[in-house]
């Protein structure tokens, strides 16, 4: 993305009607006042205008510039041009967010809702002009900062944030807000018990506790806080801590955090339980405002279509060259409207003119998910990175002393994380310090510090040493095994993987480990678990026996899910569509004829191996022999 000079550049020549309309849209989205603007040139949207103060105090800071070194996708092994980053994505989301917000405001000015006074009012009257202006500013910040805490290498390592540790004092448990949340029932007994259990176990830090400390919003220490992705929680923390001067109070900080995480004020399952007839005027107006703020939140983060998802669908396809359907983002976002779904409630929906674009957006997302994200080459690259990160985290904990973990708030900031070798241990990297953690930092650690400790690192850098998948697609897997056979293979794969794992390397070391576990159970008189371990070992040995050199080099089993179209998701089907002149909105399911598909929740797996000098295995013969061997094992353990 190229940054232009201040002001609006003047283009020579005449504009077409479409260009004139787009230029007018950009002028509207810019909302100029006394503030000066900087101009960014985006390859997809053209000129994007941002306030000079936002550019100077947010975009030009090291915390935001870090996003230039965070790759947007993990598609590069398959599509070499997939080098776009979270920096350009974040600015693109900001741009789309302004268009979406303008559409919501226009709709709010024309849609009415029941008020606490007993009369209908325009939804826009729920907020004053100053409140609308402030809401626009905060929503823009949320769009811009929604990925500011994103982990390196796309989503591969972000789960380490959940167990990460930072040198940040947490003092929420004596906080009056926390005590009030308990008294008001905002936290259930189970939620309080879980927090206390963590404290009793000596836990001193949690990213959810940290976010509560910044926002004073109990939702972030409740069970629903587990729903957002780990990078969303961390992005909230980095945004609110690093750019705290942009927020006036806890309510503003909580609103921005809810926009980034998608945690609405009124949960969908609680919406129908509100007894509007029993509310007084003040309570009624509070509920109305919460419904409106929930609509704003869903512009950035929803389960169906939002500006974050829309940008990456368009940008990924454009950048990597993947041929997909066209998504007219202008038509889609300008179709955003508020719709009344009952006498008392309203929600976000779309005008009928946007139906075709909604279908295209879901098609585009489906195509990317099935043919790009689900490609075995990309899945295996993710496995290599995940294994490398796991080993690096283990080695840092084993050989270094630090108040922080690698994947932590500290590592994302200027403060950084410092890792000192433990006494008596030598490290090729000496004292390590990581700040503004990015892809480059992990690559440095992989190449220069932990190269010998993580065998998968060599396989990551030397692509000609990588394992190959035996079957190369979901379609080929289906052709090799019928439905009943797939169920048996899924059960066998689950036994091999064990609990909570999606990938495992099967080799002699794993077989030895299983044997050790069996001997330990015999010693501890835990005989009931032994047959399960023996069966697991037999499955693993059968796989190795079928490979070249009897699997001396090992094999990787990687579990994944069969493709499931977004069209069959309930929330997509129930998306509200407004037709002028109708009292109630329709749903996408009612008006679209394409909402069909097989809700196939089966799991399947890939097997990655080294072909060796003998060349590739005969896939059909391998599949037949695998089925036969597994049947024999199942029969022996019946």
Predicted feature residues:
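Histidine-centered, transition-metal-coordinating active-site segments
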Residues: 1-141, 148-638
């Amino acid at each position: 993305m190229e940054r232009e000079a201040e002001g609006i550049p003047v283009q020579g020549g005449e504009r077409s009607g479409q260009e004139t309309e787009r230029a007018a849209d950009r002028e509207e989205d810019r909302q100029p006042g006394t503030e000066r603007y900087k101009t960014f040139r985006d390859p997809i949207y053209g000129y994007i205008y941002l306030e000079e103060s936002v550019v100077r105090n947010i975009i030009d800071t090291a915390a935001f510039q870090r996003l230039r070194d965070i790759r947007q996708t993990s598609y590069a092994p398959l599509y070499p041009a997939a080098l776009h980053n979270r920096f350009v994505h974040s600015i693109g989301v900001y741009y789309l967010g302004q268009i979406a917000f303008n559409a919501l405001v226009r709709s709010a000015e024309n849609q009415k809702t029941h008020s606490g006074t007993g009369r209908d009012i325009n939804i826009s009257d729920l907020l004053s002009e100053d409140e609308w202006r402030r809401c626009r500013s905060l929503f823009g910040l949320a769009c811009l900062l929604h990925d500011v805490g994103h982990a390196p290498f796309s989503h591969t390592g972000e789960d380490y944030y959940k167990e990460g540790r930072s040198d940040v004092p947490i003092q929420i448990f004596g906080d009056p807000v926390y005590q009030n949340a308990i008294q008001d029932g905002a936290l259930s007994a189970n939620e309080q018990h879980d927090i206390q259990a963590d404290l009793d176990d000596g836990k001193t830090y949690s990213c959810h506790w940290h976010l509560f400390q910044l926002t004073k919003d109990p939702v972030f220490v409740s069970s629903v806080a587990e729903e957002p992705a780990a990078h969303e929680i961390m992005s909230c923390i980095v945004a609110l801590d690093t750019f705290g001067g942009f927020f006036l109070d806890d309510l503003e900080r909580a609103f921005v955090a809810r926009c980034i995480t998608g945690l609405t004020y009124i949960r969908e399952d609680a919406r129908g339980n509100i007894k509007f007839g029993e509310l007084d005027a003040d309570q009624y107006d509070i509920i109305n405002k919460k419904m409106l703020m929930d609509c704003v939140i869903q512009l950035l983060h929803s389960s169906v279509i939002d500006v974050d998802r829309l940008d990456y669908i368009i940008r990924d396809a454009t950048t990597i060259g993947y041929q997909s359907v066209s998504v007219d983002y202008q038509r889609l976002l300008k179709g955003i409207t508020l719709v009344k779904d009952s006498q008392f409630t309203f929600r976000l929906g779309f005008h009928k003119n946007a139906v075709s674009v909604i279908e295209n957006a879901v098609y585009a997302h489906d195509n990317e998910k099935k043919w790009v994200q689900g490609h075995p080459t990309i899945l295996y690259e993710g496995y290599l990175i995940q294994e490398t990160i796991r080993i690096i985290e283990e080695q840092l904990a084993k050989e270094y002393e630090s108040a922080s973990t690698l994947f932590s708030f500290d590592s994302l900031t200027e403060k950084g994380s410092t890792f000192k070798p433990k006494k008596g241990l030598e490290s090729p990297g000496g004292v390590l310090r990581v700040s503004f953690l990015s892809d480059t930092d992990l690559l440095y650690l992989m190449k220069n510090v932990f190269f010998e400790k993580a065998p998968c690192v060599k396989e990551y850098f030397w692509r000609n040493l990588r394992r190959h998948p035996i079957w190369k697609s979901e379609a080929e897997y289906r052709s090799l095994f019928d439905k009943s056979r797939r169920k048996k293979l899924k059960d066998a794969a689950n036994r091999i993987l064990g609990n909570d794992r999606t990938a495992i390397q099967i080799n002699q070391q794993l077989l030895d480990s299983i044997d050790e576990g069996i001997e330990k159970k015999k010693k501890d008189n835990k005989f009931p678990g032994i047959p399960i371990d023996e069966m697991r070992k037999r499955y693993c040995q059968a796989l190795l026996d079928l490979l070249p050199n009897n699997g001396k080099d090992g094999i990787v089993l990687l579990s994944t899910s069969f493709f499931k179209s977004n069209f069959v998701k309930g929330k997509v089907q129930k998306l509200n569509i407004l037709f002028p002149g109708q009292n109630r909105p329709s749903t996408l399911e009612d008006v679209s004829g394409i909402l069909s598909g097989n809700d196939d929740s089966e799991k399947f797996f890939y097997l990655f191996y080294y072909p060796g000098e003998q060349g590739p295995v005969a896939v059909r013969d391998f599949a037949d022999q695998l089925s036969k061997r597994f049947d024999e094992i199942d029969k022996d353990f019946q």
